UniProtKB/Swiss-Prot annotation:
Its main location: mitochondrion. This is Cytochrome c oxidase assembly protein COX16, mitochondrial. Belongs to the COX16 family. The chain crosses the membrane at residues 30-50. Signal peptide: none annotated. It comes from the Eukaryota. One of its GO terms (biological process) is mitochondrial cytochrome c oxidase assembly. Keywords: Membrane, Mitochondrion, Mitochondrion inner membrane, Transit peptide, Transmembrane, Transmembrane helix. Residues 1-11 form a transit peptide.
């Protein structure tokens, strides 16, 4: 009884096709099957995610902006004048010994610390 070959028979026309040449290259160089697609996904992901991170920084720039001179002057005028001695006496006059401890309501599922 003859032994069967482990390789499939492929005609010369099949061997010259682009798919067969690529399959032979993948067998010889596994980088083409695993490494190249991985690197392609990493590089493409970088290009796709760049605009997403730019949106984050643009939103921050809109929130934090430089004030104009007029806005700056209005903020300074509306601020309360602070004198160190007056602040000291105001804080010293407060009664810090008369206070009551109150529990804060916990969120659902949060440990309240009670046994």
């Amino acid at each position: 009884m003859p032994a069967f070959q482990s390789k499939k028979f492929r005609s010369a026309a099949d061997m010259n096709s682009i798919g067969m040449r690529y399959r032979n290259l993948m067998n010889k160089h596994p980088f083409l099957m695993f490494g190249l697609p991985f690197l392609t996904v990493i590089v493409a992901g970088s290009f796709v995610l760049t605009p997403a991170t730019a949106v984050r920084y643009e939103r921050y720039d809109r929130k934090v902006r430089q004030m104009t001179k007029d806005e700056e002057l209005n903020v300074r005028r509306s601020a309360r004048k602070v004198d160190m001695k007056e602040e000291y006496y105001r804080l010293a006059g407060k009664d810090l010994d008369d206070w009551e401890q109150k529990r804060v309501k916990r969120l659902p599922g949060e440990n309240d610390g009670l046994l």
